[in-house]
């Protein structure tokens, strides 16, 4: 019996030691996660506390988001920093150093002037909850769910949101490997008598993977980075009593952006099941395009400039940029755009466009007039019926314009179809349609 009791004591000591070791490892990694937030420009952590337990621990801290960061994100001045309280429940076990640990977080707004307003929208000052799965090696899967908004005011507006979620996957160095956004529903309704309008958004699912992980400290910077993205939107409707209605159904988007030797290239495909403009409905929208030879450092400099513009002053967006120099840097890389397919339908009839454009041989420092010597462009347009019938009530003026375009040679009749081929002629510095008439003639009244 003594041997059994001794063995049990040894087992208990080993288990207790393992649990203690595991809880220490969890605390080390938890504190590393919190400390990394300070590396994000515009974030500051304070009042950090941690209560260690064997199988569960608690932690909390204040997260201050600077008004300068908010200004860059919102595009206008903000009166004060935002102060959030982040309260965490950390679950771990004896095998935490193998299996990792879970963090359940509650995020509350603390600003006195704001939290009562937030509570009127959300029912409390809790703006979001989060679940983090973290391994001791450092990998993290973070999922944030924003509190649903259910606000109605008969005099001003209605605001409703449901299941707005955001997620990040981080590697052991806290670099972002992927990001995702999900929205079940957002409904905004402006009840102002002078400008009644609605925005309805449903079924959003956006997933982006970064080919080269993005440093968490640079997550709010506007930079081109290699990625693969997919997105779906079930419904997007913009309803306005004055300006009319636009609705998109079943939108799908895929994009791939690559960078090699500071040159970027992208391939994008957009598909939309239906596009309704007032009472006119188009279906089967497809855009398949490619862009090549993008000067990534130059574009990033422009994006950096745009993100730091003081929109509340009269400062020009391009202040500090030499536009001739910037254009030269972009054009000397021989950029090109190719639209393999742009098409959509009205009933059974479709309109289709192909386009291929590029700048070749431009030298930095040349006059921008040299663009007209370096430009190549060609394309094709076809419509299964007349443009007047295709666009119908959306552009009734087309009934008068189309016959003139046909007689002048910009369009050709091909049975029931209307077609056109066009190509840029560098000698004439003009786009020639159907090898017959130039675009300049159109602007000069034929």
Regions found by a protein language model. Give the residues of each.
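Glycine-rich, small/hydroxylated-residue low-complexity segments
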Residues: 6, 14, 20-446
